[in-house]
Amino acid sequence: MTEQDVELVTMRRVSLRLLPFLFLLYIFCWLDRSNISIAALQMNSELKFSSAAFGFGAGVFFLSYSLFEVPSNLILARVGARRWLARIAITWGLLACSMMWVRTPLQFYAVRFLLGMAEAGFFPGVIYYLSLWFPATYRARAISGIIIGIPLSQVLGAPLGGALLGLTGVGHLSGWQWLFLVEGLPPVLLGFAALAYLTDRPEDARWLSTQQRDWVSSRMQLEREQTVAAHDSPLRALGHPLLWVLILPYFALCTIGYGATFWTPLLVRDALGTSDSATAVIVGAIYLLAALVYPLAGMLSDRIGDRCGMTALGLAFYCVGGIGVALLPHTILRVLALAVLQIGNPIFMTSFWCVPTKLLKGSSAAAGIALISSIGTTGGFFGPSIIGYLKQTTGSDSGAFLGLAGLALLGAFVCIGLRQATAFRPRPNLIGVAPSSQSA
């Protein structure tokens, strides 16, 4: 076989081995952190949670997630992805199940905080893990193959959650309790499966032939040697100025993205006056639209190579959608604005994480990715909390969405300014992808 044939076969085998399993884990990751948005349709009234209490509880997850993300990713780089991702999945699944016993706002806050602590490091850990297996020119498509689980978790989870809400009375449990129990158990099982299924590095992959192992190992070693900022320690990597600049766009994404995600079912029901089950189906349709954009965004990002430009475009969708949610009447038009907003996620996510993995290598990459994710993810606390507080105190969420749209616009301008500083060009002989001279 020619070298290009070896490359094609190797990357296909790596993709088929790793991406479906990580994709499944990621679906439940998102399902267990965001299923309170569906549970809230029933839980808030039963437990008498105010808008402010729900918003704070939804967001407090991200405070602990942010605090423990960097140390979690450093441990992953030391002990290997197989064991650490398994630990994360098992503990978050058990804590997700424990949400069914919540009765007071304080208990709600405590379990959400512990859930964030348990899940800390999963997403940046997966990004780092992919950077060990996928060359830069394949990475956006690999990332898109994983994070398409974000909208699909809602496409599947919203109707499933709506159905589980209908189990009220079965086993003397409320429907929202069944929701947390049923959706929390699978990650525990997947965590144990990860111990047997995942492989830490290409050099250890017995499921690849010797020729395939040699190709991917040498290719990844070559990329590590050519890394733009070849920091030799995690602490030195954290001083890279571009990493700190990248925090703002990600913070903007998390603030408006999580703010919208946790409130979407309630906003849809308020706008259309639908039942809980019908609301869940409509929410699923919104995320289905976003899911269809993921593979297209990943292919386009790899083809043109303009990572920062694509990231800015994603934030522009968030901005336009946020303005629409704020200003349009509470009708189907507001639901369409929510759909426009959610389309920004695949465009942003498939490109953004290619930038830090190009800047850093090894444990430095693990630390850098975790730094961006941990600080940026605090937006997941502020977004839902701000919407809930303003909704309760002013009776409207329009001001909150206008402010979040402005933050998204600021993040887009930062990405545009970063294009020259993070230039990325695909290899001329990349199979199936035209060479590009555009910047990242």
Question: What are these regions, as identified by a protein language model?
Answer:
Residues 36-37, 237-295, 349, 353:
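Extracytoplasmic gate region of multi-pass secondary transporters
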Residues 307-355:
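C-terminal transmembrane helical hairpin of 12-TM major facilitator-type secondary transporters
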Residues 48, 80, 101-107, 118, ...:
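Helix-breaking motifs and short loop linkers at transmembrane-helix boundaries and internal kinks
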